[in-house]
Design a protein with these regions (language model features):
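Short, solvent-exposed loop/turn segments at the edges of secondary structure
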Residues: 1-3, 52-54, 260
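Short, glycine/acidic-rich beta->alpha junctions
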Residues: 2, 92-96, 226-227
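Mature, solvent-exposed C-terminal subdomains and processed small-chain segments of exported/organellar
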Residues: 3, 13-20
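Phosphate/diphosphate-binding loops
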Residues: 4-8
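Flexible, glycine-rich linker and terminal segments associated
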Residues: 20, 269-271
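C-terminal outer-membrane beta-barrel translocator/porin domains of Gram-negative envelope proteins
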Residues: 25-191, 195-220, 257, 265, ...
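C-terminal structured "cap/appendage" subdomains that terminate the fold
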Residues: 200-203, 209-259, 263
Length: 271
């Protein structure tokens, strides 16, 4: 699918640490679904068309008491984001995410950091299928390192033209990370090494072949047994071009069909 549109948002500070975000967006999503696409995609197009339009209001709140946004050693960061498709449009939906980060100084140089994030999406009004192009994806940088990006969640393996299962994403997700950071010897404060433990998964609708031999789909209910875990080590560098992170990860409970990726890097701050 391909999404085009425009958005406008602005932030309003109302305390030293708190900020509110307000905005809106209009989007048109062109869905190219055919007989080899996941059955849920085909049913969605049959019901809502191949080019649904949505107008959504966005709202958010953040609180940031970290001592440094690039390389924090203490403090808390929270962010709540909401997106609601307005009534009367092709799709009426809502989705929310909440992120919580906490940095604990263990000594002058060692820091323990926690990051947790949850996401939830659903529909209302005349819409009864959550738009799959609004799904959450888990896996890879920013969630569970050691697995390929966006691969931890419901899959559809009914496409006989494709040996690999399609990663569908989900309308619910959880991920959490714990990092222990320390500076490299030599006093260079722009370089830090870290060890980490990640966990996460997304839940939604998975594809399967029913008793009649036809492609179908069903909800994948929340279960902690679906969670994937990984651990590893890495280097964080505040470079002249911006913050960089390099990690070497080892999946702890890889299951059949999972796609792994040991070495990963990211540009930007945060987990």
């Amino acid at each position: 699918y391909e999404t085009r549109g425009a958005s406008l948002a602005f932030g309003i500070p109302f305390t030293e640490n708190d900020r509110v975000f307000l905005g809106g967006k209009i989007e048109s999503t062109k869905v190219d679904a055919n007989s080899n696409s996941p059955q849920r995609y085909q049913d969605y197009v049959n019901r809502y068309g191949a080019d649904p339009v949505s107008v959504a209001a966005t709202v958010g709140w953040s609180r940031d008491s970290r001592d440094n946004s690039l390389a924090p050693t203490r403090g808390v960061y929270q962010r709540l984001n909401g997106e609601v498709g307005l009534p009367g449009m092709d799709i009426e939906y809502y989705k929310f995410t909440y992120q919580y980060q906490h940095y604990f100084p263990l000594s002058r140089t060692w820091t323990l950091a926690f990051n947790g994030e949850v996401g939830y999406g659903d529909v209302y009004g005349q819409t009864d299928m959550f738009p799959f192009f609004k799904n959450f994806y888990v896996g890879g940088i920013g969630s569970v390192r050691g697995f390929e990006s966006g691969t931890l969640g419901p899959k559809d393996s009914t496409n006989k033209m494709n040996d690999d299962a399609d990663n569908l994403g989900g309308d619910r997700m959880v991920n959490a990370s714990l990092e222990l950071l320390a500076p490299l010897p030599g006093g260079d404060r722009t370089l830090r090494i870290f060890g980490f433990l990640d966990a996460g998964y997304a839940w939604g609708y998975e594809g399967f072949v029913n008793a009649n031999g036809h492609a179908d789909y069903r909800r994948q209910e929340f279960s902690m047994s679906d969670m994937r875990y990984s651990t590893g080590i890495g280097v964080a560098w505040i470079s002249p071009l911006g913050p960089l992170k390099f990690s070497l990860a080892f999946p702890l409970n890889e299951k059949e069909g999972d796609k792994t990726q040991r070495f990963q890097f990211q540009i930007g701050t945060g987990f």
